[in-house]
């Protein structure tokens, strides 16, 4: 839950300053992704009023402040991934060609087919798919470390949901494809169906979690650099 904060209060507190002085938002916004910056803005517009939710958010920020972790994802991955995921028109679906076999002739046909589409949708889709593979694999390693911290696991169930998705059998091919640099037509068709169509909701859930991590690390870094002390969260009386 969150309480409503009006524009006048936001201005009085200098949350989003339109003047030359730095705003509170600008002070804490060192996010590496556009998604992270947007979520931080939403947090200021919709402050939490629930003790458990505030405690959880505080614990997550405290964890990143304590461990001094940096954001391990590349911003360029998210631009490519978001652009790719935004178009779910069936006409843009990548399909494998069952007529192409393993012979040298078929291999040549396959390469020619890819070249024809290089400057259009195939190249963009391939870049988006590979970016998602990198994001999910990085998130896999990152959350595996987080899951070992009792302070985090004791206050949030979100991490369990993330691990459930990543550890599921359907995402196993994504983990196995770590570090892949190019996709064949069949590989592109397989991952396109898996990520953009069959599991679109789960993929967006993972991305949203990464954007929140971006925010927590951004806030934690600002706090540590400026010597800020984390306030103790107490329940209302």
Regions found by a protein language model. Name each.
Residues 4, 205-237:
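Conserved NTPase motor "head" modules and their coupling/switch loops across ABC/AAA+ ATPases, GTPases
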Residues 166-192:
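Extended, charged coiled-coil "arm/hinge" scaffolds of SMC/Rad50-like chromosome-maintenance ATPases
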Residues 1-173, 202, 209-212:
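Conserved amphipathic alpha-helical "coupling/scaffold" segments
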Residues 195-198:
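An accessory alpha-helical subdomain
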């Amino acid at each position: 839950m969150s309480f409503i904060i009006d524009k006048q209060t936001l201005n009085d507190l200098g949350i989003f300053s339109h003047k030359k002085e730095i705003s509170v938002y600008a002070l804490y916004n060192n996010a590496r992704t556009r998604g992270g910056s947007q979520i931080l803005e939403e947090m200021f517009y919709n402050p939490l009023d629930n003790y458990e939710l505030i405690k959880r958010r505080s614990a997550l920020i405290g964890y990143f402040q304590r461990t001094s972790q940096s954001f391990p994802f590349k911003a360029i991955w998210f631009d490519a991934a978001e652009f790719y995921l935004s178009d779910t028109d069936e006409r843009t679906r990548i399909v494998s060609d069952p007529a192409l076999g393993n012979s040298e002739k078929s291999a040549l046909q396959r390469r020619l087919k890819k070249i024809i589409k290089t400057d259009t949708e195939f190249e963009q889709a391939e870049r988006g798919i590979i970016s998602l593979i990198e994001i999910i694999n990085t998130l896999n390693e990152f959350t595996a470390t987080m899951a070992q911290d009792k302070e985090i696991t004791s206050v949030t169930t979100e991490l369990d949901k993330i691990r459930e998705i990543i550890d599921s059998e359907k995402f196993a091919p994504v983990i196995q494809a770590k570090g892949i640099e190019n996709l064949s037509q069949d590989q592109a068709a397989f991952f396109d169906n898996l990520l953009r169509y069959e599991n679109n909701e789960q993929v967006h859930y993972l991305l949203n979690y990464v954007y929140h991590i971006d925010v927590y690390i951004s806030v934690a870094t600002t706090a540590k650099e400026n010597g800020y002390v984390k306030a103790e969260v107490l329940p209302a009386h």
